Amino acid sequence: MSDTPAQTPEPSKKTPEPSGVDLARVALRAAKEQARARGDAAQQKRQARRGGLRSGARADGRDPMALGAAINRLLTERGWETPAAVGGVMGRWPQIVGEDLAKHCVPQRYDEDERVLTVQCDSTAWATQLRLLAPQLVARLNEDLGHGTVRLLKVQGPGGPARRYGPLRAPGSTGPGDTYG
């Protein structure tokens, strides 16, 4: 090793530093080369093609979107996922419980706070059958809707006919005692 300092080029032999527009061009060229080396440009082009049309520089809520995506976004924003899912189950009731049971038992309402699905049957025999199948049915509903959506299946028998007036009506009575089918 020698104690002599390294030779530095003299200031008069330096290349001139770019300024203004030239400096901007040099910086842009360097940024493009670095992005190309990382692969960002190709990735951005793929994302632009996938993303579709946009209304401005960034994607926002006003951009065009598919109807299904817009409905899903609305359900998520309003917190309607569970009621919408239960409504879907009420529409798909025959596929979930089977054709025989669906002919005789119909879902009436869903209490979101208590997570109780109320089902009405057209005879006491079918109501008893559904009460026996309730644990399996709750498990199947939770499998379709998400865990814990339905905690209890409330089974109601058939509604008796309303007999408020007529020759067989006793004044002050509470109605028919046993008219279940």
UniProtKB/Swiss-Prot annotation:
Pfam families referenced in this protein's UniProt entry, alphabetically: DciA (PF05258)
Bias kind Polar residues: ranges: 1-10
Chain coiled-coil ranges: none
Bias (Basic and acidic residues): 30-39
Domain of life: Bacteria
Intrachain disulfide bonds: none
InterPro entries tied to this protein: DciA-like, UPF0232_actinobac
Annotated stretches, region: Disordered: 1-64, 156-181
Similarity comment: family membership: Belongs to the UPF0232 family.
Protein name, entry field: UPF0232 protein SAV_4320
Biological source species: Streptomyces avermitilis (strain ATCC 31267 / DSM 46492 / JCM 5070 / NBRC 14893 / NCIMB 12804 / NRRL 8165 / MA-4680)
